[in-house]
C-alpha cells in the first residue's frame, strides 16, 4: 500500500500546485492570454486560408490596453462588440482619440472626429468586416487585448501583424504629446 512518506509528499505537491492557480488566473485575466481568431474580416493578415477550417491563435497582451495611449495605429486588437458584450471582434486600430477619419458606407457621415477615449477600428478585408464603419468609434474600455504574435499554427510564426492591408482612412492625425 502507501507509505506515510509518499502520501505526505503527494499532499505537499498537490497543495503547491493548487497554490499556483490564483497566480496563473491573475496572469491570464490581466496580463497575457491566448485567443482564437475566427472569421475572414482580418484576411490576409489572420486566417488567410479560407479553404481549410484552420484558424490562427494569437498571444494577447492585456495589461494597460484600455488606455488609448498604449495603443498605436495598425495594432490588431480584440474587443467586446459595442452592440453585444458577449461577442468579441478582432480588428485593426486605424484611428486614435482626436483623429479625423474618412468613413465608408454604411457610416452615416463622410467624416468623424474621434472623441477622447475612443478609437476607430477596421478589418483588413473591408468587404467582409463589421467594424467602426458599422457601429462608429468604440470606447477604449471595450478593448480586451492587443495581438502580439501568432502562436498557432507554427507555419505562421513570424507573421508581421503590423503590416496592414487595409485602407488609410485618416484625413487628420491628432498631435499627441
Swiss-Prot record:
The molecular function terms of the Gene Ontology recorded here are: endopeptidase activity; serine-type endopeptidase activity
- Effect in UniProt of substituting residue 91 to H/R: Abolishes enzymatic activity
Question: What Enzyme Commission number(s) does the record list for this chain?
Answer: 3.4.21.-
What PTMs does it carry? The N-terminus is blocked.
Q: Which UniProt keywords apply?
A: Hydrolase, Membrane, Mitochondrion, Mitochondrion inner membrane, Protease, Transmembrane, Transmembrane helix
- The organism's superkingdom is given as Eukaryota
Q: Where in the cell is it found?
A: Mitochondrion inner membrane
Effect annotated for changing residue 124 to N/Y: Abolishes enzymatic activity
Upon changing residue 131 to N/E, the result is: Abolishes enzymatic activity
**Residue numbers annotated as active site:** 41, 91
Question: GO terms for biological process?
Answer: protein processing involved in protein targeting to mitochondrion; signal peptide processing
User: Gene Ontology cellular component?
Assistant: mitochondrial inner membrane; mitochondrial inner membrane peptidase complex
Return the Gene3D superfamilies for the record.
Umud Fragment, subunit A
* SUPFAM superfamilies the UniProt entry points to: LexA/Signal peptidase
| Pfam families listed in its UniProt record | Peptidase_S26
Q: What class of enzyme is it?
A: hydrolase
Q: Which residues cross the membrane?
A: 134-152
Looking at the keywords, is Membrane present? yes
Give the membrane topology: Single-pass membrane protein
- Subunit (UniProt): Component of the mitochondrial inner membrane peptidase (IMP) complex which at least consists of IMP1, IMP2 and SOM1.
Q: What does this protein do?
A: Catalytic component of the mitochondrial inner membrane peptidase (IMP) complex. IMP catalyzes the removal of signal peptides required for the targeting of proteins from the mitochondrial matrix, across the inner membrane, into the inter-membrane space. The two catalytic IMP subunits seem to have non-overlapping substrate specificities. IMP2 substrates include nuclear encoded CYB2, mitochondrially encoded COX2 and cytochrome c1. Required for the stability of IMP1.
Q: Which family does it belong to?
A: Belongs to the peptidase S26 family. IMP2 subfamily.
Q: What is this protein called?
A: Mitochondrial inner membrane protease subunit 2
What is the scientific name of the source organism?
Saccharomyces cerevisiae (strain ATCC 204508 / S288c) (Baker's yeast)
Question: Encoded by which gene?
Answer: IMP2
